[in-house]
Amino acid sequence: MFETILIANRGEIACRVIKTCRRLGIRTVAVYSDADAGALHVEMADEAVRIGPPPAAESYLNIEAIVEACRRTGARAVHPGYGFLSERAAFARALEAAGITFIGPPVAAIEAMGDKIESKRLARAAGVSTVPGTLDSIADPDEARRIAREIGYPVMIKASAGGGGKGMRIARDERELLEGIARARSEARSAFGDDRVFLEKFVEEPRHIEIQVLGDRHGNIVHLGERECSIQRRHQKVIEEAPSPFLDKATRKAMGEQAVALARAVGYHSAGTVEFIVDRHRNFYFLEMNTRLQVEHPVTELVTGLDLVELMIRVAAGEPLPFRQEDVRLEGWAIEARVYAEDPGRGFLPSVGRVVRYREPHGKDIRVDSGVVEGAEVSIHYDPMIAKLCARGHDRRAAIARAREALDAFLIRGPAHNLSFLSAVLAHPRFQEGRLSTGFIAEEFGERFRGAGLPPERLEEIAGVTVRLRLDRARREARASGKLPGWRYRPERDWVVQLDGVCFAVTLLADEDERSVLHIVDRHLEVAVDWRPGDPVVRARVTGSTFTLQVDPLPEGWIVRHGGAELRALVRTRRAAELAARIPEKVRADAGKMLRSPMPGLILSIAVQPGDEVKAGQDLCVLEAMKMENVLKAEQDGRVEEVRVRPRDTVAADQVLITFA
């Protein structure tokens, strides 16, 4: 076994690997860029080495610096995590040349599977089902048109060296084909230094289902079942689960056998994932093989009871797998939700900034993998994922319920985040029924998230909770010293709660230290809360139901977050509500007269010029930030007055890019 392992990564995956190494008694070395000098993975490791400035190309992708860090610290093995250098054959080869063990597959397997075109050839040769399409990169637009006509629209444009959703586009006609190839090549060139793209038939209503494989250096290869990864946005996975609610035993067995056959064909050892797309008839087609640990590996760990990182380390040390295929058992159900620093209300644009408050949910069968602590900075330079929240249940319904409750209790303040959006996805009837496809988010939520709806009964209960909070606050204030002699607390009887414009008349029937009895609409509610002033997380008990919500104070109430909804709750006495109704509301300033940059980044292109008439939703410019090309669109119809930036300009967060007349 290794004495010291260097983790060539950052964030939650570096922390995840360190935890397993600690349990195994292995010393760990972290590497970090200047932007990550105070990061959690640096703090957790036994030793840390600076490898360069913030840009990944000068730090986490710097092979020479990482090999030198191994030499300096005596690390005889490297775990690459995922992303960065994890699938770079040149990195594995450099470690091998330095006498350092790469905790991953052999170089030949990385090379074979790293090229999407070559991997498809190998898959066909190994008897794996593949999607109709070309096996060669596209030479020119004429060839692209010809191939698309042969296999039929829609087609998928894919970067040969691609991954993580980058360099991928769907084209439904010739115009989209030519535009998509140009955009995919640009994105692939920027992300991978390789602008080759190829075409394949796009499967309508596809599911994205992958098989986890694991092999040792002694020729033993097994699969650990599947993961359902169909909930995606712009080809990036958002929610994953194991097992899939769609597969039957026969399809699961066939997919597992083909995944193992492909792994065996390339002499694979370590952990890897064979990805398939599956149509509505359970026909499945090879997509790609990821020769590394996947982001979503925890759901497999939760249903198998295995530690994949430990097994990778033991395999790299030459140990055989301690079990065979017939020993693999899948028990229960697990769901993972990726928590991103992004703004769902602004087209899911990445968000940056300091994490002002951070507290993870805890409880039975809840797991959070994170590289963030309170006070950490979400940087422009790296992927905006904050954490992965995982929940396990005895069945799918129980796992979903546990995940929803945990999301409600997950406290994050600072950068914008997608917790409410994740809750809304899990609550959606179509998700709960398991009717999934990779188009689910686009079909059900569109390009921006405007909050989930809540049933009337839950709104009534939330109204009751906000009144109880108001009474609790008044009761605490009454206990403060310095009150006038003879003054004592007398709770108001009649209240009006306004939840985003919907008014509830609330009558206080009884008020005690532990609970309040309220009449709302036609219900008598017994309300109790577990809450400390200053803490946004509230545990509420309302006449037989228990739920969690978060509150942030307003002058006359709270911003309430629960179940994917964000509500403005104004809590007034009946008299105050009557007076407020007579006061005219202030007219808000028109913020639609300018387009501001949502984050620091680089302007790649501008699609408009002064005098142009634009429609709501029209593309205005492309901003490169956090490893992605983000298309900024018009909020409303209007006419361009001034364009204040040019392509290749570096812009700051909130900088005005375009103004409108």
What function would you assign to each model-found segment?
Residues M1-V274, V278-H297:
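N-terminal beta-alpha lobe that positions the nucleotide/phosphoryl donor
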Residues D173, G215-N220, D279-R282, H362, ...:
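Short acidic-glycine loop/turn motifs at beta-strand connectors
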Residues A259, P298-E526, D619, A653-T659:
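Catalytic cores of soluble metabolic enzymes centered on carboxylation/carboxyl-transfer
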Residues D307, A510-V537, R541-T548, E556:
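Conserved nucleotide-binding/hydrolysis modules and their immediate coupling elements
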Residues R392-A398, A403-R413, P584-P598, L602, ...:
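Conserved bacterial/organellar gene-expression machines centered on ribosome-associated P-loop NTPases
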Residues T546, D552-P598:
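Catalytic P-loop NTP-binding/switch module of NTPases
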Residues K586-A661:
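Structured functional modules or segments
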